[in-house]
Amino acid sequence: MIDCMRVSLALVLVGSLGMTACASVAGEPLASQVQSASMGTPFTLKPGETARVTSEQAQVRFDRVTADSRCPRNVQCVMAGEATVRVSVTLRGQAERTLELRTTPQDEQTTAGDYLLKLADLVPLPDAGRPVKPADYRATFILTPAPK
């Protein structure tokens, strides 16, 4: 009985160490979740992914879609609806800022430091009666210098 408990405890400890080894360090995204992006060029992210604009020392992480009331595909709606995405932005080593962007023209972009971050696209559209699974979203962003 005691040997069985020791084996179980050993398995739990080994599993915990394995999961810890896969975690990111100090909030930094894993290398597989970071893609390179260029200033002024659209880049597309899945939830949890980060784009790094090295020339500007900027990072944009697509955290998640917080709301999606857009008109479903193959449905005729009176209003188009909107979706809201949450992003985390880090500029030149400063503290991370959390921002929200919407798919409506008046709220699709915001200023982050000396930059303008625009939500250029969010796919897929929902299907009637079936919401989009969070992991299926893809958001396209563009980072440009803010107008002076």
Name every feature range the model reports, one short phrase each.
Residues A23-A26:
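Bacterial signal peptide processing site
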Residues A120-K148:
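C-terminal partner/receptor-binding element of secreted or periplasmic proteins
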